[in-house]
């Protein structure tokens, strides 16, 4: 099995990249893909860049050039579920856009025209993440992750998202685009991110301070998932 792992930012991929054996680098379209082996599993690690367009371009390049069997999206997220604290884990059951609106044509909020309302994560990958969460004794929430081209900072955008998507657990800027591309390519995916900030009026300060914590925690999860896949081969 070949696993594609996607992070948006340098801080979100550097720990994993440094662990890859026999690493090679492919640069395309402003993205970097690092291939090799990690924990006995063939891996293609993408640094996509920030935002939905960068994530979609990078995911497409990753799928076309490396043809991974599954995709894991790692990195940081802003927590909206009250049970989430800095460093906790959020696992996608589904992902949606929070900044898409074609409701005038009968679509649901966040649903792109001619697309599903949500992009649903793979059950087996969710189960794998759950197994690793249990073995690592981490606090985690599973549910809806919403994506948009905005860093959510302040009461007004936060209230809008919560009103529109009452079940939302976390927000970030790439996961729905990654899920969208995986849907188009019929490739199983899951989003496993660590909380860098709790989405409120001070979230930009928290993000800067705790991004490294989120990077360590999300890397810990990816390593555990790869190690489990290696044992199950």
UniProtKB/Swiss-Prot annotation:
CDD domains for the chain: MTAN
Region forming the signal peptide: none
Keyword field contains Transferase: no
Enzyme class: hydrolase
Keyword annotations: Amino-acid biosynthesis, Hydrolase, Methionine biosynthesis
Cited InterPro entries: MTA_SAH_Nsdase (IPR010049), Nucleoside_phosphorylase_d (IPR000845), Nucleoside_phosphorylase_sf (IPR035994)
Bilayer-crossing regions: none
Any Pfam family hit: PNP_UDP_1
EC number of the protein: 3.2.2.9
The protein's annotated pathway: Amino-acid biosynthesis; L-methionine biosynthesis via salvage pathway; S-methyl-5-thio-alpha-D-ribose 1-phosphate from S-methyl-5'-thioadenosine (hydrolase route): step 1/2
Catalysed reactions, as listed in the record: S-adenosyl-L-homocysteine + H2O = S-(5-deoxy-D-ribos-5-yl)-L-homocysteine + adenine; S-methyl-5'-thioadenosine + H2O = 5-(methylsulfanyl)-D-ribose + adenine; 5'-deoxyadenosine + H2O = 5-deoxy-D-ribose + adenine
Entry's Gene Ontology BP terms: L-methionine salvage from methylthioadenosine; L-methionine salvage from S-adenosylmethionine; purine deoxyribonucleoside catabolic process
List of residues binding substrate: 78, 152, 173-174
Active site: 12 (proton acceptor), 197 (proton donor)
GO cellular component: a single term: cytosol
Molecular-function GO terms, alphabetical: adenosylhomocysteine nucleosidase activity; methylthioadenosine nucleosidase activity
Entries under NCBIfam families matching the protein: MTA_SAH-Nsdase, PRK05584.1
Role summary: Catalyzes the irreversible cleavage of the glycosidic bond in both 5'-methylthioadenosine (MTA) and S-adenosylhomocysteine (SAH/AdoHcy) to adenine and the corresponding thioribose, 5'-methylthioribose and S-ribosylhomocysteine, respectively. Also cleaves 5'-deoxyadenosine, a toxic by-product of radical S-adenosylmethionine (SAM) enzymes, into 5-deoxyribose and adenine. Thus, is required for in vivo function of the radical SAM enzymes biotin synthase and lipoic acid synthase, that are inhibited by 5'-deoxyadenosine accumulation.
Similarity comment text for this entry: Belongs to the PNP/UDP phosphorylase family. MtnN subfamily.
Subunit structure: Homodimer.
Protein name (record): 5'-methylthioadenosine/S-adenosylhomocysteine nucleosidase
């Amino acid at each position: 099995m070949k696993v594609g792992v996607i992070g948006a930012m340098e801080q979100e991929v550097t720990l994993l990249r440094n662990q890859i054996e026999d690493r090679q680098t492919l640069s395309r379209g402003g993205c970097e893909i690092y291939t090799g082996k990690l924990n006995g599993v063939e891996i293609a690690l993408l640094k996509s860049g920030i935002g939905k367009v960068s994530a979609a371009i990078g995911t497409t390049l990753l799928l076309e050039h490396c043809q991974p069997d599954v995709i894991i999206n790692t990195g940081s997220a802003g927590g909206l579920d009250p049970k989430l604290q800095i460093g906790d884990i959020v696992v996608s059951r589904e992902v949606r856009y929070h900044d898409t609106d074609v409701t005038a044509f009968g679509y649901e909020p966040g649903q792109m025209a001619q697309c599903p309302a949500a992009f649903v994560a793979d059950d087996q990958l969710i189960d794998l993440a759950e197994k690793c969460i249990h073995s690592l004794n981490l606090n985690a929430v599973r549910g809806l992750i919403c994506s948009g081209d905005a860093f959510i900072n302040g009461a007004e955008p936060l209230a809008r998202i919560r009103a529109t998507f009452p079940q939302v657990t976390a927000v970030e800027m790439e996961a729905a685009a990654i899920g969208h591309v995986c849907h188009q390519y019929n490739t199983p995916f899951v989003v496993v991110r660590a909380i860098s900030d709790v989405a409120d009026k001070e979230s930009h300060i928290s993000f800067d301070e705790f991004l490294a914590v989120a990077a360590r925690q999300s890397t810990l999860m990816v390593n555990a998932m790869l190690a489990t896949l290696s044992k199950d081969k």
